């Protein structure tokens, strides 16, 4: 399996999507149902500022699998969120890191 990172960039209008509790609950349930999404979370320029995007680290066999995961996420709204996908590897593969 390959490790992938996804960098999401949000427009300011994405804040309304984030504020929708029903959609947020669906997003959290979706993430929990996909253990291949190893880590994920929102990005802010500074702790006291609004979210401007997100970061995911995923293990998947193909870019297509990663894109499917993105496109089916309840938080993905193409008008308000763009993304870039990159392959990713650890410099110290033998070292285990817990966040």
Regions found by a protein language model. Give the residues of each.
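Conserved, structured core segments of small domains
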Residues: 1-99
